Amino acid sequence: MYTLELLLKGNPAPIVVHQKEEEAANRAYQSIVNALQSGSPQSLELTCDRTGKKVFLLTGELCGVQMTSKSGSASPMGTRPGFLAQLQS
């Protein structure tokens, strides 16, 4: 199972879309990245394989996307996969 997390401007909770196949997840990820790089807002519809739910959004409200693979093992100490930003003062 692959998870795409879409980060929206001004919203702390990501929109999560699950894909069963790696190829489908990569296609969805690449379409999101291409839409973000185009610079002009576009409409985007994604379907979640886990629940069959759909989401429709404008890419102008997106500020990032992350794709992760869910393995059978739990993350150490309850941490999620992702990136850690170090802010310098």
Swiss-Prot record:
It comes from Synechococcus sp. (strain JA-2-3B'a(2-13)). This is UPF0367 protein CYB_2632. Belongs to the UPF0367 family. Disulfide bonds: none annotated. It comes from the Bacteria. Residues 69-89 are annotated as: Disordered.
